[in-house]
């Protein structure tokens, strides 16, 4: 009889390499926020993948970048601390991009860890097969990886194979979470992330990092209806105008798209109320960062 495997796996990589897409693919639900804007993941999102023979808890770390404010410092601290807590590390890179300074910075960091490190080349659907092997050899010249696996998280190509390879390196152990649990974050947190994702999709480049979402109230009013009130925080009046849009059109569209995903998450009808408030320079206010849910790990 095959022993049951269980373990914690950290996904690390530069912004926009597809970490959140991968987590959502293997879990089968939208847990991690997805956007083409950089630095959209702010907390360690734990997605729980349960199979008959294994349970893997994926920790989706914030993309590595040079911090520009207190929130950035926090995101980097989360990423680095994660490396010391887990059973395996997925270093995810874009197969269709050159190795950059950010990749080299991460590799230097990974050389000092004793945990197995898997190089996962994502977005192979965008690369000609002849270009893949030279890219793999280039990465191999930097360090010895435990395994190297090319995938496409978006299409699901080679993802199951990677999971099979990963499982062989995980320790034998019990299930840490019930079969039907897909995240260790409360539903309120995931709801806030869904709202933030819709804003990122609908707003311009100046907005993304200045957006914070706090779910103020979430009440089940009846068997099939949940009432949610949430506040969207921006740093400037001009940003507030962009999020609301002409005649409230943009905010209405954010609500419409968010409600659809939240209803799928909760399995019930949702009445969603959204407000937009200005909190100047909030990304440098530690107490406010904690208040809206980006909380430091307790020792």
From Swiss-Prot:
GO biological process, one term: ribosomal small subunit assembly
Region (G4): 122-125
Record-linked PROSITE patterns: G_ERA, KH_TYPE_2
Protein's cellular compartments: Cytoplasm; Cell membrane
Stretches the record annotates as G2: 39-43
Broad class of the protein's primary localization: cytoplasm
GO molecular function, one term: small ribosomal subunit rRNA binding
Occurrences of domain KH type-2 (ranges): 203-280
Membrane protein topology class: Peripheral membrane protein
Cellular-component GO terms for this entry: cytosol; plasma membrane
Location of region: G1: 13-20
Keywords: Cell membrane, Cytoplasm, GTP-binding, Membrane, Nucleotide-binding, Ribosome biogenesis, RNA-binding, rRNA-binding
Binding-site residues for GTP, renumbered to this chain: 13-20, 60-64, 122-125
HAMAP family in alphabetical order: GTPase_Era
Protein name: GTPase Era
């Amino acid at each position: 009889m095959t022993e049951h495997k269980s373990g914690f796996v950290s996904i690390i990589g530069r912004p926009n390499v597809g970490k959140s897409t991968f987590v959502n693919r293997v879990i089968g639900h939208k847990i991690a926020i997805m956007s083409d804007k950089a630095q959209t993941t702010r907390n360690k999102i734990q997605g729980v993948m349960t199979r008959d023979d294994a349970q893997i808890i994926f920790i989706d770390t914030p993309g590595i970048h040079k911090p520009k404010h207190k929130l950035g410092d926090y995101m980097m601290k989360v990423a680095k601390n994660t490396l010391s807590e887990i059973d395996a590390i997925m270093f995810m890179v874009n197969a269709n991009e050159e190795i950059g300074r950010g990749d080299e910075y991460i590799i230097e960091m990974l050389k000092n860890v004793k945990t197995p490190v898997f190089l996962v080349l994502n977005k192979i659907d965008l690369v000609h097969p002849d270009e893949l092997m030279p890219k793999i050899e280039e990465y191999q010249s930097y360090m010895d990886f435990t395994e190297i696996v090319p995938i496409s998280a978006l299409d699901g190509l080679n993802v199951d194979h990677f999971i099979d390879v990963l499982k062989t390196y995980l320790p034998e152990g019990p299930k840490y979470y019930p079969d039907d649990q897909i995240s260790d974050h409360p539903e309120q947190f995931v709801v806030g992330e869904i709202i933030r994702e819709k804003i990122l999709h609908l707003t311009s480049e100046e907005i993304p990092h200045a957006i914070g979402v706090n779910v103020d109230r979430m009440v089940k009013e009846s068997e099939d209806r949940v009432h949610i009130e949430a506040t969207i925080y921006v740093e400037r009046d001009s940003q507030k105008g962009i999020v609301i849009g002409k005649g409230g059109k943009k905010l209405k569209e954010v609500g419409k798209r968010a409600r659809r995903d939240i209803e799928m998450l909760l399995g019930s009808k949702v009445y969603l109320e959204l407000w937009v408030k200005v909190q100047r320079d909030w990304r440098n206010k530690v107490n406010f960062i904690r208040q809206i849910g980006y909380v430091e790990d307790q020792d």
